[in-house]
Protein backbone atom coordinates (compact mmCIF):
# COMPACT_ATOMS: atom_id res chain seq x y z
CA UNK A 1 0.00 0.00 0.00
CA UNK A 2 1.30 3.43 -0.97
CA UNK A 3 1.55 6.19 1.66
CA UNK A 4 -1.16 8.28 -0.07
CA UNK A 5 -3.53 5.27 0.05
CA UNK A 6 -3.04 4.81 3.78
CA UNK A 7 -3.58 8.56 4.27
CA UNK A 8 -6.74 8.44 2.15
CA UNK A 9 -8.28 5.62 4.22
CA UNK A 10 -7.48 7.48 7.46
CA UNK A 11 -8.93 10.68 5.97
CA UNK A 12 -12.11 8.88 4.81
CA UNK A 13 -12.63 7.35 8.26
CA UNK A 14 -12.04 10.70 10.02
CA UNK A 15 -14.59 12.41 7.75
CA UNK A 16 -17.18 9.66 8.35
CA UNK A 17 -17.05 8.80 4.64
CA UNK A 18 -15.89 5.25 5.38
CA UNK A 19 -17.80 3.65 8.23
CA UNK A 20 -17.94 0.17 9.71
CA UNK A 21 -21.00 -1.56 11.18
CA UNK A 22 -24.02 -3.07 9.44
CA UNK A 23 -25.44 -1.39 6.34
CA UNK A 24 -28.07 -2.50 3.82
CA UNK A 25 -26.92 -1.65 0.30
CA UNK A 26 -29.18 -0.88 -2.69
CA UNK A 27 -28.34 -4.38 -3.92
CA UNK A 28 -30.02 -5.78 -0.79
CA UNK A 29 -26.74 -7.10 0.57
CA UNK A 30 -25.85 -6.42 4.19
CA UNK A 31 -22.39 -4.87 4.16
CA UNK A 32 -20.03 -4.46 7.13
CA UNK A 33 -18.78 -1.17 5.71
CA UNK A 34 -20.22 1.84 3.91
CA UNK A 35 -18.58 4.52 1.75
CA UNK A 36 -20.37 7.85 1.22
CA UNK A 37 -18.25 10.29 -0.79
CA UNK A 38 -20.95 12.96 -0.36
CA UNK A 39 -19.48 13.59 3.11
CA UNK A 40 -16.31 15.09 1.61
CA UNK A 41 -18.41 18.23 1.93
CA UNK A 42 -16.10 21.08 2.95
CA UNK A 43 -13.57 23.14 1.04
CA UNK A 44 -10.55 21.57 2.70
CA UNK A 45 -11.96 18.03 2.36
CA UNK A 46 -12.61 18.53 -1.35
CA UNK A 47 -9.13 19.99 -1.90
CA UNK A 48 -7.56 17.06 -0.09
CA UNK A 49 -9.71 14.57 -2.02
CA UNK A 50 -8.52 16.13 -5.29
CA UNK A 51 -4.92 15.55 -4.22
CA UNK A 52 -5.63 11.86 -3.57
CA UNK A 53 -7.27 11.48 -6.99
CA UNK A 54 -4.30 13.21 -8.61
CA UNK A 55 -1.82 10.94 -6.79
CA UNK A 56 -3.71 7.84 -7.97
CA UNK A 57 -3.80 8.83 -11.63
CA UNK A 58 -0.14 9.93 -11.64
CA UNK A 59 0.82 6.63 -9.99
CA UNK A 60 -1.09 4.74 -12.72
CA UNK A 61 0.93 6.37 -15.52
CA UNK A 62 -2.26 6.77 -17.58
CA UNK A 63 -1.97 9.04 -20.62
CA UNK A 64 -4.91 11.45 -21.08
CA UNK A 65 -5.68 14.89 -22.54
CA UNK A 66 -8.79 16.16 -20.77
CA UNK A 67 -10.64 15.53 -17.48
CA UNK A 68 -14.39 14.91 -17.56
CA UNK A 69 -16.62 15.10 -14.46
CA UNK A 70 -20.05 13.56 -15.13
CA UNK A 71 -23.06 15.38 -13.66
CA UNK A 72 -23.69 15.71 -10.85
CA UNK A 73 -21.28 14.11 -8.39
CA UNK A 74 -18.40 14.00 -10.84
CA UNK A 75 -18.39 17.77 -11.41
CA UNK A 76 -16.63 18.87 -8.17
CA UNK A 77 -14.45 15.73 -8.29
CA UNK A 78 -13.26 16.53 -11.80
CA UNK A 79 -12.59 20.15 -10.83
CA UNK A 80 -10.70 19.17 -7.66
CA UNK A 81 -8.59 16.65 -9.59
CA UNK A 82 -7.74 19.21 -12.28
CA UNK A 83 -6.67 21.75 -9.62
CA UNK A 84 -4.53 19.19 -7.77
CA UNK A 85 -2.82 18.01 -10.97
CA UNK A 86 -1.96 21.62 -11.84
CA UNK A 87 -0.81 22.66 -8.35
CA UNK A 88 0.84 19.47 -7.10
CA UNK A 89 2.09 17.83 -10.29
CA UNK A 90 2.55 20.76 -12.72
CA UNK A 91 0.09 19.20 -15.15
CA UNK A 92 -2.31 21.95 -16.18
CA UNK A 93 -4.97 20.05 -18.10
CA UNK A 94 -8.33 21.11 -19.53
CA UNK A 95 -11.48 19.87 -17.81
CA UNK A 96 -15.18 19.84 -18.56
CA UNK A 97 -18.50 18.48 -17.38
CA UNK A 98 -21.98 17.84 -18.72
CA UNK A 99 -25.38 19.20 -17.83
CA UNK A 100 -28.21 16.75 -17.31
CA UNK A 101 -30.48 19.12 -19.25
CA UNK A 102 -29.43 20.80 -22.50
CA UNK A 103 -29.55 24.62 -22.54
CA UNK A 104 -31.28 26.31 -25.45
CA UNK A 105 -29.82 29.78 -24.78
CA UNK A 106 -26.38 31.26 -24.07
CA UNK A 107 -23.65 28.82 -25.09
CA UNK A 108 -26.27 26.04 -25.42
CA UNK A 109 -25.66 22.31 -25.44
CA UNK A 110 -24.93 19.91 -22.60
CA UNK A 111 -21.15 20.30 -22.25
CA UNK A 112 -19.49 23.04 -20.19
CA UNK A 113 -15.79 23.89 -20.00
CA UNK A 114 -13.02 22.72 -22.29
CA UNK A 115 -13.80 20.86 -25.52
CA UNK A 116 -14.22 17.13 -25.02
CA UNK A 117 -11.51 15.93 -27.40
CA UNK A 118 -8.66 13.45 -27.44
CA UNK A 119 -8.16 10.97 -24.60
CA UNK A 120 -10.66 11.55 -21.79
CA UNK A 121 -10.19 10.74 -18.09
CA UNK A 122 -13.59 10.24 -16.43
CA UNK A 123 -13.63 11.13 -12.71
CA UNK A 124 -16.38 9.83 -10.40
CA UNK A 125 -16.79 8.60 -6.82
CA UNK A 126 -17.58 4.89 -7.24
CA UNK A 127 -18.89 2.50 -9.88
CA UNK A 128 -21.86 0.59 -8.50
CA UNK A 129 -23.72 -0.79 -11.52
CA UNK A 130 -21.80 0.83 -14.37
CA UNK A 131 -24.95 2.56 -15.68
CA UNK A 132 -23.53 6.07 -15.24
CA UNK A 133 -20.34 5.13 -17.12
CA UNK A 134 -22.39 3.77 -20.02
CA UNK A 135 -24.18 7.13 -20.26
CA UNK A 136 -20.83 8.96 -20.16
CA UNK A 137 -19.47 6.76 -22.95
CA UNK A 138 -22.31 7.90 -25.21
CA UNK A 139 -21.39 11.55 -24.52
CA UNK A 140 -17.70 10.91 -25.25
CA UNK A 141 -18.42 8.94 -28.42
CA UNK A 142 -20.79 11.67 -29.65
CA UNK A 143 -17.82 14.10 -29.51
CA UNK A 144 -15.56 11.63 -31.39
CA UNK A 145 -13.32 11.53 -28.33
CA UNK A 146 -11.79 8.45 -26.73
CA UNK A 147 -12.18 7.29 -23.12
CA UNK A 148 -8.70 6.80 -21.65
CA UNK A 149 -9.91 5.45 -18.29
CA UNK A 150 -12.05 6.02 -15.23
CA UNK A 151 -10.75 7.37 -11.91
CA UNK A 152 -12.76 6.52 -8.78
CA UNK A 153 -12.24 6.72 -5.02
CA UNK A 154 -12.99 3.13 -3.95
CA UNK A 155 -13.08 -0.22 -5.74
CA UNK A 156 -15.32 -2.48 -3.64
CA UNK A 157 -13.95 -5.53 -5.51
CA UNK A 158 -17.42 -7.03 -5.37
CA UNK A 159 -19.17 -9.08 -8.02
CA UNK A 160 -22.61 -8.31 -9.43
CA UNK A 161 -25.90 -9.96 -8.50
CA UNK A 162 -25.48 -13.30 -10.30
CA UNK A 163 -23.22 -16.07 -9.04
CA UNK A 164 -19.81 -15.96 -10.66
CA UNK A 165 -20.50 -12.59 -12.28
CA UNK A 166 -17.84 -10.01 -12.86
CA UNK A 167 -17.84 -6.83 -10.79
CA UNK A 168 -19.34 -3.71 -12.37
CA UNK A 169 -15.78 -2.37 -12.67
CA UNK A 170 -14.57 -5.49 -14.49
CA UNK A 171 -17.55 -5.21 -16.85
CA UNK A 172 -16.66 -1.59 -17.65
CA UNK A 173 -13.02 -2.57 -18.26
CA UNK A 174 -14.09 -5.45 -20.50
CA UNK A 175 -16.80 -3.60 -22.45
CA UNK A 176 -14.83 -0.42 -23.10
CA UNK A 177 -11.27 -1.77 -23.02
CA UNK A 178 -10.07 0.89 -20.63
CA UNK A 179 -8.68 0.79 -17.09
CA UNK A 180 -10.59 1.77 -13.96
CA UNK A 181 -8.15 3.34 -11.49
CA UNK A 182 -9.11 3.68 -7.82
CA UNK A 183 -7.45 5.59 -4.99
CA UNK A 184 -7.94 2.45 -2.90
CA UNK A 185 -9.57 -0.96 -3.19
CA UNK A 186 -11.16 -3.15 -0.53
CA UNK A 187 -7.85 -5.04 -0.35
CA UNK A 188 -6.12 -1.93 1.01
CA UNK A 189 -8.99 -1.24 3.43
CA UNK A 190 -8.50 -4.78 4.82
CA UNK A 191 -4.77 -4.15 5.15
CA UNK A 192 -5.46 -0.89 7.00
CA UNK A 193 -7.89 -2.61 9.40
CA UNK A 194 -5.35 -5.34 10.14
CA UNK A 195 -2.79 -2.70 11.15
CA UNK A 196 -5.14 -0.53 13.26
CA UNK A 197 -5.60 -1.62 16.88
CA UNK A 198 -8.92 0.22 17.34
CA UNK A 199 -10.47 -0.82 14.02
CA UNK A 200 -9.18 -4.40 13.95
CA UNK A 201 -12.46 -5.58 15.51
CA UNK A 202 -14.18 -4.95 12.14
CA UNK A 203 -11.68 -7.07 10.18
CA UNK A 204 -13.42 -10.49 10.49
CA UNK A 205 -16.77 -9.13 9.22
CA UNK A 206 -15.16 -7.35 6.25
CA UNK A 207 -13.08 -10.44 5.44
CA UNK A 208 -16.19 -12.65 5.57
CA UNK A 209 -18.03 -10.25 3.24
CA UNK A 210 -15.08 -10.29 0.83
CA UNK A 211 -15.08 -14.09 0.84
CA UNK A 212 -18.80 -14.19 0.10
CA UNK A 213 -19.11 -11.46 -2.53
CA UNK A 214 -15.56 -10.59 -3.54
CA UNK A 215 -13.94 -11.06 -6.92
UniProtKB/Swiss-Prot annotation:
Keyword Transmembrane: no
Cofactors that this protein relies on: Mg(2+)
Binding site for orotate: 34-35, 128, 156
Record-linked SUPFAM superfamilies: PRTase-like
Gene Ontology terms, MF aspect: magnesium ion binding; orotate phosphoribosyltransferase activity
Superkingdom of the organism of origin: Bacteria
Catalytic activity, EC: 2.4.2.10
Pfam families, sorted: Pribosyltran
InterPro entries: OPRT, Or_phspho_trans_dom, PRibTrfase_dom, PRTase-like
This protein's UniProt keywords: Glycosyltransferase, Magnesium, Pyrimidine biosynthesis, Transferase
Catalytic activity: orotidine 5'-phosphate + diphosphate = orotate + 5-phospho-alpha-D-ribose 1-diphosphate
Gene Ontology process terms (BP): 'de novo' pyrimidine nucleobase biosynthetic process; 'de novo' UMP biosynthetic process; pyrimidine ribonucleoside biosynthetic process
HAMAP family attached to this UniProt entry: PyrE
Protein name: Orotate phosphoribosyltransferase
Gene designation: pyrE
